[in-house]
Swiss-Prot record:
Family: Belongs to the UQCR11/QCR10 family.
Spans within the Mitochondrial intermembrane topological domain: 45-62
Domain of life of the source: Eukaryota
Species assigned in the record: Solanum tuberosum
Role of this protein: Component of the ubiquinol-cytochrome c oxidoreductase, a multisubunit transmembrane complex that is part of the mitochondrial electron transport chain which drives oxidative phosphorylation.
Lineage of origin: Eukaryota, Viridiplantae, Streptophyta, Embryophyta, Tracheophyta
Transmembrane region(s): 26-44
Name recorded for this polypeptide: Ubiquinol-cytochrome c reductase complex 6.7 kDa protein
Subcellular location: Mitochondrion inner membrane
Keyword Kinase attributed: no
Membrane topology per record: Single-pass membrane protein
Length: 62
């Protein structure tokens, strides 16, 4: 059995060792992704749409 870390290294075997992404690279990319999503939500501010769509139940019209 191989460890998950060893199995994950196989994804980037085709790259030279110097070009392979390190764990800090992946952490940085995830951090920037969170920052980008947070910034997009702050700019768009779709709170009314989200409340109407997911939180409030619409009354059925007869």
């Amino acid at each position: 059995m191989t460890s998950p870390a060893a199995a994950g290294n196989g994804l980037f075997k085709f790259l030279r060792p110097k070009l392979r992404p390190q764990s800090t690279d992946i952490q940085a990319a995830a951090g920037w992704g969170v920052a980008a999503v947070t910034g997009a939500l702050w700019v768009i501010q779709p709170w009314d749409f989200l409340r109407k769509t997911f939180i409030e139940k619409q009354e059925e019209e007869k």
